[in-house]
């Protein structure tokens, strides 16, 4: 078989980097190679189809929170799967699976082929036990979850609390949350083109409660974006904390005391 055409994808270096990252996270751990993708696409092409593609996705999420001075590692989840789509005339057939083995891929491709052959547009969830990736979890260089270790994540939230309490003695309670997400997508089309996207997302939030004369008010601050946890340097944290504390104090001072 001829080598897959990359289209104009060689023009932008980051695109190739993203593709390499996606392949290492979405294909490598499950023993999938370019050969398996081509085989799955060829399986669908046995029926007359106008277009076909494979869609791989993995989303990893981690959350940490601080309350009452204690940091809890909240949630950690990995959501992943593969979707197979074929278009024949007016018909669109789509099947997806949670597991990403070679068998699952071919199974989904055969399901799509039979739907397309029957001439009905349908979406099908193909059975199979969700597959857990091999134990050594790979972090892409762009994965924000891997940019700080757990000790650093704890230290970051403790710093938020320390700064907030130091701002004003009326601050009686501090809650902080840290969330990181890494979304990797890869599409393989029947014409040989391959595309990938790697999207990190991080967020830091802080909520403070200030108390004066028995009355309590709440203020919050925070922010984030599509980058690593290294973004949360002292000046950024300071800004979020200032915003939260000032909001709580403004609320305290704005209402007349009866």
Name each model feature, range by range.
Residues 2-258:
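Active-site bordering "gate/hinge" segments
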């Amino acid at each position: 078989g001829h080598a897959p055409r990359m289209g104009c994808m060689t023009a932008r270096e980051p695109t190739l980097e993203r593709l390499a990252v996606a392949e290492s996270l979405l294909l490598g751990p499950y023993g999938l190679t370019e050969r398996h993708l081509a085989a799955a696409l060829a399986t669908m092409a046995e029926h007359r189809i106008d277009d076909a593609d494979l869609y791989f996705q993995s989303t990893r999420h981690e959350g940490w929170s601080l309350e009452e001075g204690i940091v809890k590692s909240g949630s950690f989840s990995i959501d992943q799967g593969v979707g197979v789509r074929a278009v024949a005339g007016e018909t669109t057939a789509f099947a997806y699976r949670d597991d990403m083995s070679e068998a699952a891929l071919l199974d989904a491709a055969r399901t799509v082929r039979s739907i397309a052959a029957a001439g009905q547009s349908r979406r099908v969830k193909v059975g199979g036990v969700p597959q857990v990736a091999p134990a050594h979890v790979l972090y892409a260089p762009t994965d924000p979850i891997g940019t700080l270790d757990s000790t650093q994540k704890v230290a970051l939230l403790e710093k938020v609390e320390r700064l907030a309490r130091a701002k004003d003695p009326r601050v009686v309670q501090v809650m902080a949350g840290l969330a990181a997400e890494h979304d990797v997508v890869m599409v393989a089309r029947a014409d040989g083109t391959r595309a990938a996207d790697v999207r990190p997302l991080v967020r830091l939030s802080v909520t403070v409660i200030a108390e004066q004369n028995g009355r309590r008010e709440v203020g919050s601050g925070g922010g984030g974006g599509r980058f690593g946890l290294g973004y949360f340097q002292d000046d950024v944290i300071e800004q979020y904390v200032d915003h939260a504390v000032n909001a709580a104090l403004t609320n305290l001072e704005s209402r007349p005391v009866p």
